[in-house]
């Protein structure tokens, strides 16, 4: 049986991920948690623009309805 999306997120816990949001925003950070709505918690988060870091954050919570994809 194929992995379900939440199974893939579970396997990506405590590893670096890139999260693409609506409006072409991207964040990179260590995935610390998620829920069934795909709300995400990232540590050491950075906002990327055209592959370059434009802002650094500590921990961030990303609302799941803004997520386009999560790349482990």
Curated annotation (Swiss-Prot):
Residues 4-72 form the Sm domain. GO terms for cellular component: ribonucleoprotein complex. Keywords: Ribonucleoprotein. InterPro entries: Lsm7/SmG-like (IPR044641), LSM_dom_sf (IPR010920), Sm (IPR047575), Sm_dom_euk/arc (IPR001163), snRNP_Sm-like_arc (IPR022901). It holds the Pfam family LSM. NCBIfam families: PRK00737.1 (NF001963). PANTHER family: SMALL NUCLEAR RIBONUCLEOPROTEIN (PTHR10553), U6 SNRNA-ASSOCIATED SM-LIKE PROTEIN LSM7 (PTHR10553:SF5). Belongs to the snRNP Sm proteins family. This is Putative snRNP Sm-like protein.
